[in-house]
């Protein structure tokens, strides 16, 4: 009898939890039930970006792109955080500055014209100092690095900025998908996830 009572109580608890979960899902999806569809505020760059005319004239060999352009000026300093290996290809840690710091301060400019192609010499849409280092774990050892940026002001305090139409924030990631030769995996799946939930990060090709 004791085991039967315990088993019955267990199933009652499971049933109660299931009912609560169903109610939560119903409440969260109430707008969908009313309208019959979920409103998406997700910006899909590949579908919504305005086509740009080809540049008629600019300096010979000047870099020119229809994508947003981010220029990081480190003043010639190497960005720390690259993976180090020994002669037997064993991981030995990460690179640092001569002073032992694991990040440096640099200057960032973002060229993001809505009508024209972007060039390094264009007037920037956003300028800020940044604290930058190589990001990742095993990806630190890849030939193509990704970077973590913290936007700061002249006092070193957080400097949230809107970049490429995304919500303002002071922390950003430049992801270099070395193993994804299509360059589409993160862009595609972040956007698909963003259609299902608000917590998926925004993403742009640049």
Task: Name what the model sees in each region.
Residues 10-206:
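Phosphate-handling architecture centered on phosphoinositide signaling
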Residues 1-8:
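Short, Lys/Arg-enriched N-terminal segments with co-localized hydrophobic residues
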């Amino acid at each position: 009898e004791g085991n039967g009572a315990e088993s019955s109580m267990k199933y009652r608890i499971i049933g109660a939890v299931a009912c609560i979960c169903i109610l939560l899902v119903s409440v969260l999806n109430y707008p969908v039930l009313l309208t019959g569809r979920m409103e998406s505020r997700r910006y899909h760059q590949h579908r919504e970006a305005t086509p740009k005319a080809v540049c008629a004239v600019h300096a010979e060999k000047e870099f020119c792109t229809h994508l947003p352009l981010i220029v990081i000026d480190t003043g010639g300093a190497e960005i720390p955080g690259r993976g180090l290996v020994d002669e037997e290809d064993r991981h030995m840690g990460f690179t640092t500055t001569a002073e032992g710091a694991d990040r440096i301060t640099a200057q960032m400019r973002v060229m993001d014209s809505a009508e024209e192609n972007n060039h390094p010499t264009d007037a920037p849409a956003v300028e800020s100092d940044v604290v930058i280092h190589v990001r990742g774990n095993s990806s630190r050892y890849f030939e193509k690095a990704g970077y973590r940026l913290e936007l700061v002001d002249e006092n070193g305090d957080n400097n949230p900025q809107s970049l490429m139409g995304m919500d303002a924030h002071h922390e950003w990631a430049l992801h270099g998908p070395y193993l994804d030769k299509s360059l589409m995996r993160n862009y595609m799946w972040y956007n698909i996830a963003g259609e299902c939930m608000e917590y998926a990060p925004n993403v742009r090709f640049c």
